[in-house]
Design a protein with these regions (language model features):
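Adenine nucleotide-associated cytosolic modules
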Residues: 1-268
Length: 268
């Protein structure tokens, strides 16, 4: 595949990098990333992946754009209020970079559809805002041997980790089981500073880009936390994969996917 003059100019700041070059940019254009949730995390992740020239990007979200989303979900604008989030996101991404194919899935992830959703993608980004969805995404990715980036944001704090099959603990190794319903507030209940999604969602995009390129160190076996009020990042080394883990352990007890409760809040 030969690049056009326009592509050489568009991706020139990538191509000049020793870690990327023409070969790496071709890897990005051939890459496929699925983003679950077109909200506070998914919005910046989608925009940076599209700008980077990741060739195929899937967006999963059943919701419509609400006015309260616009404080942080920068892929949508005022004129998009009432529009399906996946449609709004696709329009923004296509306007930014016509090289990118954007696949839209206007649905919630469930135990019945998630394996079909993730099967054709190289890397998954979890941009959801509830524990049932996060555990479902983890379990499906472990079963399908798909790498993924987990992240969460609330108030002035954020965190993320990356799972790559065979290279460290999964989300369930670390957090075991979903907390009781309503035990942990959502962003809607507790609030979130808008720029937090930009910080953490952009880091999720960075993890996906590094994975596709095969460069640098991923957040496998590590949890990165950010406190915006203190302006402090910390990287915590996680325990090794739990050989007793219910999904990725030596003798898994979870052999089929389940929905812990109705997943009604798909993104931040």
């Amino acid at each position: 595949m030969a690049f056009t003059n326009e592509q050489m100019e568009r991706y020139s700041r990538h191509i000049i990098l020793q870690e990327v070059g023409v070969k790496g940019q071709k890897k990005l254009l051939n890459g496929k990333v699925l983003i679950i949730g077109a909200g506070g995390l998914g919005a910046p992740a989608a925009m940076y992946l599209a700008a980077a020239g990741v060739g195929t990007i899937g967006i999963v979200d059943a919701d419509e754009v609400d006015l309260s989303n616009l404080q942080r979900q920068i892929i949508h604008g005022t004129a998009d209020v009432g529009k399906a989030k996946v449609k709004s996101a696709k329009e923004t991404m296509n306007a930014m970079n016509p090289d990118v194919t954007v696949n839209t899935y206007r649905e919630f992830v469930t135990s019945e559809n998630i394996m079909d959703l993730i099967k054709d993608y190289d890397f998954i980004i979890d941009g959801t805002d509830n524990f049932p969805a996060k555990f479902l995404i983890n379990d499906a990715c472990v079963m399908a041997k798909k790498p993924f980036s987990h992240a969460g944001i609330i108030r002035f704090k954020g965190q993320l980790m990356t799972y790559v099959p065979g290279e460290g603990p999964c989300y369930r190794c670390v957090f075991k089981n979903p907390p009781p319903k309503d035990a942990v507030p959502t962003c809607k209940q507790a609030g979130v500073i808008g720029a937090m999604g930009g910080v953490i969602g952009s880091l999720q995009a960075m993890e996906a880009i590094k994975y596709l390129l095969g460069v640098g160190d991923l957040l496998t076996g590590k949890l990165l936390t950010f406190d915006a009020l203190k302006m402090e990042f910390h990287t915590v080394k996680l325990p090794k994969a739990d050989h007793k883990c219910a999904i990725c352990g030596d003798h898994p007890t979870i052999t089929q996917l389940i929905d812990y409760e109705q997943i009604e809040c798909p993104d931040h």
